Amino acid sequence: SRIVARVEIKTNAQLQQMARAGVITSRALDAAVAAARPGVTTDEVNAAFERTMLELGGTSNFYGYYDYPATVCTSVNHEVVHGIPGDYVLKDGDILSIDGGAYVIDPATNRQWHGDSARTVLIGNASEARAELSAVTREAMWHGIAALATAKKVGEIGLAIEAYVTEEYGDKYGIIEDYVGHGIGSQMHMAPDVLNYAVRDMGPKIKP
């Protein structure tokens, strides 16, 4: 399997390499977001990400992964995740998810270290409903991240996310359970699974 089953513990030096990959991914996403506007194709959004990633010395960890043909995923409106860039022309009011990643190679060890992130973009004048959906999702993410300050187990992240959504909005919004977050490091997809919802099994312990 390409997915490592055990949780990978990193050294400080390895975390620094991951930070390099994360910065490259973030700046490439900045370029992709800036390119995403009415009249632009999702393929052009992909090209903006790729151009910046390469300029900064990163290598795509999406392209060629299980034969994936692009450097980002572009999911528009009803598409949940993993949409493939192409000739779709973005329109005023669309909601676009851009998911991309990059890796760097540690010159001391020749090992890869990966970054992977996503952004949601409201194209032009999106509806209030779509703007609220994006805002609620972002805030839920930050509640999950904040939970890490005191969490003992990985499952507390999903618990915090679900608690925020249900306590603030009741049943107005649901949480998709078909896809989950994941660990990252010397590979793009690694243990542990990071759920966005609460489950009985709280998963592995969090180690400093």
Residue ranges and their predicted role:
Residues 1-208:
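Active-site neighborhoods and metal-handling regions in enzymes and metal-associated proteins
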